[in-house]
Structures are given as C-alpha cells and as structure tokens.
C-alpha cells in the first residue's frame, strides 16, 4: 500500500541504572554496535524523513558516539514518562506525516515488522505493536471491547480482572502527526506513577471513534527491552543464533553455530567453512572455498577464493588474493595485502605491507611499510626496521629475493631482483640485483674455553 511520509521518534533518555555503568544504557553494544544505532539503522532503512532522538542522561556521550546526519536531538531534561518524552519531540512533527515511536533499548526490532505496522495503520487511527505473554506481570495490558482495542492499562493501575489479560503493549506505535500532537496535549499524570503515559493516547483515540489496529511482531525478541547486562547478553545470543541460522541456510558451514560471532556484515561465496569461536567484525567478504580456523578475528577485510586462515589469526583492513595461507597466530594489520598464493606463517606481523605472488614469510617476522615482490622468501626472524622514533620509512624488495633468517632491513632501503641476503645480516644500504649481501662480525674460536661456574 502507499504510505504517508514518516518520521521516527526514538526514546533514549533513560539513565540505565541497572547497567551499573558510566555509559548511557543505549550505547551499550549488541553485536558490536550500540543498541540505539540498531534502532536508528532500522528507522533509516524504513525510509524515515527525520529521526528525532529524545535524550537526557549522558547527552554528550551520545552525541560523540552517534554521527548520523539524519538525527534531530531532542532534550528531555526531566524524565516524566514516555508521554512527556513525546511531548518534547511534538513541535517537530508535521501534520501530514506519520509518527513512529521506537525505543533505544529495544535493539532487535525488524524493518519487516515495522513495515507491517506502518501498512496496518488505519487512516486517522493508530497502529499498535502488541504481543501475548504467558506471564504479563509488569506490562501494560491491552483492553478490548468486542474485539476492538479500547486502551492500555499500566500494570500498577490495572484492576485484578485487567491483570488477567495476556496481551500486552510493546510501546511501539504509529499515528498521524496532527493527531499525535492533539492527543499529547491532552495527557495528564493522574496515575500511580505520577507520569505522563504515551499509552493514554489509545483511550483518547478510541473516545474519538478512531480505529486502533494491533499487529504482532514475527519474533518476541524483536520487542524485548534491555534493562541490565543479563538481558543484553541474552539478546546478543538470540541475535547471533539468528545470524548463524541465516548463514547455514545460505550454505556457510559453521562448525558450531553457538560459538560464532558476527558483529557486522558478512558477504560470502560457496563452500565456506568457519570453525569455532571466530569473530567477524565490520564489513567482511569471503570468497569461494575459504576456510577459517578456530579463534580467528576477521575485521573489515576481503578474503579471496581458496584462502585458508589457520587458528588464532587476527586480520584487520586487509586484502587477500586467491589461494593465500595465513597463520596460525599471525597478525595482519591495516594496509596489509597478499597477492595470489602468498603465505604468512605463525607469529608474523604485517602492516602497510604488500607480499607478492607466491612469496612467503614463514615465521617470527615483522613486515611494516614494505613492498615485497613475487616469489620472495622471507626467513625467520626478519624485521623491517621502518621507524626512527619520528618517521616511518619504506622497504622495497624485488622479485625472487631470498632473505636469510635473522635479517634486519633498515629502511629506507631497496633490495634488487634476485638478490640474496645472508642470514644474520643487517642491511643498511641498497642491494643490487642478483647480488649477495652479507654483514657479520668475523667468527672467532677459543679452544678449551670453559664457562664460568657459580660459586656455591
């Protein structure tokens, strides 16, 4: 159906006392992203013309963390209830737009459910998201008459009969801007809490003969709020289980779905295998037949076809061409690039360095600010000395170079194609093509020498 223009209000003013944290509750993360950012993203994906964020506690921290240009910051200086929060945002509502009300601590609400709610909203009425619970204690009850929604009664204000109702209010609703402003102006705080309840607009709408349509979410987790870290951890597990299920159904082999963590977006090819306790962060692309070993962390990287990343390897902001092998216990830092068939072994660290086709750095090596050609062998214990305490310098190694173990390359330095660096060499000057570079202290030998003995 054709929808009106729509703006979203996100309530995010609560202190989050039960989190026992200096951080505003809505900035605590789920899947590596602030809870409120999940809600903002849903609003934007839904096509919100404006997103009004009602804040109070920790406003400076919120503004530092949330940089969305579509946000309109609305201060709620006193926390006097949900209705009061909406009253602060009301001056920004256009009469001819719909207003959708969301919560910064309800992070798993889906765009699909919100779109169904938006589509179901009757002309001049209210769309309301509700669920039925076996134990509705503490929640506002949905009252009905002949099947039609007539109002919402908060638990503390409900009669014994009303407390038997299992259908409860999730707090998420949508209504026309002009209607919303009119109803908000009529709210009172004549209740047990002494607060202004947004839920009272349901009864006001019913009294005007307006229709209220209730919609149910696809999953209960979509409307579960977070008040403490235990609830947050449970929603994290729900979210991760859902992501793992999607990946399994799409053909990714997760060896243990309960021990897989997605904190971003994963794009993948066919026949990908991911072992236990792997963390995917940011935007990650895995090609066909990629294998990732246990305990790896992959962040904002592109991994080519047929690559294998062995256990406990950390990869961040990296590009790997096809058929590369990494690890175990390797660290590829931002700017590392491996061309086809390159190999980085255990305890090798790379940063802002390119390793050419078929080149190998097998173990115990640091490669920083380096450009390494094809078919190069980097021996164990090799270090590119790229930093003088103030500036970084580059090391360039041509194709077919052999670098012996325990070599230090003091940048800036260039090693020509086909050169050989003898083990234990400190390279301080450029090395020509096909040359042998060797710098060692002459070996001496003392016959019959005895080691010192400790005195007893």
Swiss-Prot record:
According to UniProt, the reaction catalysed is: alpha-D-glucosamine 1-phosphate + acetyl-CoA = N-acetyl-alpha-D-glucosamine 1-phosphate + CoA + H(+); N-acetyl-alpha-D-glucosamine 1-phosphate + UTP + H(+) = UDP-N-acetyl-alpha-D-glucosamine + diphosphate
Pathway(s) per entry: Nucleotide-sugar biosynthesis; UDP-N-acetyl-alpha-D-glucosamine biosynthesis; N-acetyl-alpha-D-glucosamine 1-phosphate from alpha-D-glucosamine 6-phosphate (route II): step 2/2; Nucleotide-sugar biosynthesis; UDP-N-acetyl-alpha-D-glucosamine biosynthesis; UDP-N-acetyl-alpha-D-glucosamine from N-acetyl-alpha-D-glucosamine 1-phosphate: step 1/1; Bacterial outer membrane biogenesis; LPS lipid A biosynthesis
Q: Where in the cell is it found?
A: Cytoplasm
Protein EC: 2.7.7.23, 2.3.1.157
- Is Nucleotidyltransferase tagged as a keyword? yes
Keywords, comma-separated and alphabetical: Acyltransferase, Cell shape, Cell wall biogenesis/degradation, Cytoplasm, Magnesium, Metal-binding, Multifunctional enzyme, Nucleotidyltransferase, Peptidoglycan synthesis, Repeat, Transferase
Looking up InterPro entries in the UniProt record yields: Bifunctional_GlmU, GlmU-like, GlmU_C_LbH, Hexapep, Hexapep_transf_CS, MobA-like_NTP_Trfase, Nucleotide-diphossugar_trans, Trimer_LpxA-like_sf
Pfam families associated with the record: Hexapep (PF00132), NTP_transf_3 (PF12804)
- Which parts of this chain are annotated as the region N-acetyltransferase? 251-456
Keyword Plastid assigned: no
Q: Which cofactor does it need?
A: Mg(2+)
User: Which residue ranges are recorded for the region named Pyrophosphorylase?
Assistant: 1-229
Ranges where the record places region Linker: 230-250
| Molecular functions per Gene Ontology | glucosamine-1-phosphate N-acetyltransferase activity; magnesium ion binding; UDP-N-acetylglucosamine diphosphorylase activity
Q: Which residues bind Mg(2+)?
A: 105, 227
Which residues fall in a coiled-coil region?
Answer: none
Specify the enzyme's EC class, one word.
transferase
Task: Locate the active site.
Answer: 363
Mind telling me which HAMAP family this protein's record contains? GlmU
Q: How does it assemble?
A: Homotrimer.
Please identify the protein, giving its name as recorded: Bifunctional protein GlmU
- This chain's source organism reads Shigella boydii serotype 18 (strain CDC 3083-94 / BS512)
